[in-house]
């Protein structure tokens, strides 16, 4: 996809691994970076996303679905989950556009990731769009702890999985209360979702600290993103 910012950027898609406590692959999040036409500048999605039009967000979401279609047998064969971030602007389109809905619904292993800044998230199941999405697709709250939402939507059972925010984790990791605080979160949230995951695992030392705390899966710089051509290497380790 080509995005028109200060100059033209094109999207490049990668797969970000999610591992279990034994460092075995359980799923992959499809992420995008944006590169200038000359390749000299690259930006992550979080910097570009606020400047994308609804049409550009739609094109990026469709581009991710198209990539997922090319490697769906890999996900099925290895029993992996795929996560795609769902921008708020695309939520209603997904429910109203039958073709887009069908393209997403055909993948039984696909789960949609929603950020804490999703409009009306604090309404929980009273948010009609969010409730309808949860009826049709497994949802993941992608950055719990970012400080932009309450726990209502989690306790309302709208999310199959919850991922703790990487910045939240890395800030807390510097405190001596990290382990008991994480135990408290696990105890509070686990009964309201199928899987509680943790991001921000950038080192072996951090993985060793987090692994015994009761999380079901882990994501971070310890397992860098890979292009589609290197997917097979993730299951050969």
Curated annotation (Swiss-Prot):
Annotated EAL domain residues: 1-237
Pfam family, one: EAL
SUPFAM superfamilies: EAL domain-like
Keyword vocabulary terms for this entry: Repressor, Transcription, Transcription regulation, Virulence
Mitochondrion found in the keyword field: no
Domain of life, per lineage: Bacteria
Functional summary from the UniProt entry: Acts as an anti-FlhC(2)FlhD(4) factor by binding to FlhD, decreasing its ability to bind DNA, and thus negatively regulates expression of flagellar class II operons, decreasing motility in nutrient-poor medium. Required for resistance to host phagocyte oxidase.
Subunit structure comment from the entry: Interacts with FlhD in the FlhC(2)FlhD(4) heterohexamer, inhibiting its ability to activate transcription.
Family membership noted in the UniProt record: Belongs to the YdiV family.
Name this polypeptide is given: Anti-FlhC(2)FlhD(4) factor YdiV
Species whose genome carries this gene: Salmonella paratyphi B (strain ATCC BAA-1250 / SPB7)
């Amino acid at each position: 996809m080509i995005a028109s910012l200060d100059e033209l950027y094109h999207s490049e898609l990668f797969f970000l691994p999610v591992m279990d406590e034994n460092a075995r692959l359980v799923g992959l999040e499809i992420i995008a970076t944006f590169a200038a036409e000359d390749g000299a500048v690259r930006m992550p999605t979080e910097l570009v996303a606020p400047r994308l039009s609804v049409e550009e967000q739609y094109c990026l979401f469709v581009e991710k679905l198209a990539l997922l279609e090319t490697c769906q047998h890999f996900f099925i064969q290895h029993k992996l989950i795929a996560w795609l971030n769902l921008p708020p602007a695309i939520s209603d389109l997904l429910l109203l556009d039958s073709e887009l809905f069908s393209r997403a619904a055909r993948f039984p292993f696909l789960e949609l990731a929603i950020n804490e800044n999703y409009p009306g998230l604090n309404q929980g199941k009273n948010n009609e769009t969010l409730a309808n999405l949860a009826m049709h697709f497994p949802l993941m709250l992608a950055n719990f702890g970012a400080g932009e939402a309450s726990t209502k939507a989690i306790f309302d059972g709208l999310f199959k999985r919850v991922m703790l925010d990487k910045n939240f984790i890395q800030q807390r990791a510097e405190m001596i209360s990290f382990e008991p605080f994480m135990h408290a979160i696990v105890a509070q949230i686990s009964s309201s979702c199928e899987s509680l995951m943790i991001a921000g695992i950038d080192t072996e030392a951090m993985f060793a600290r987090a692994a015994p705390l009761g999380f079901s899966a882990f994501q971070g710089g310890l397992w860098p993103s890979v292009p589609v051509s290197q997917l097979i290497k993730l299951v050969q380790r």
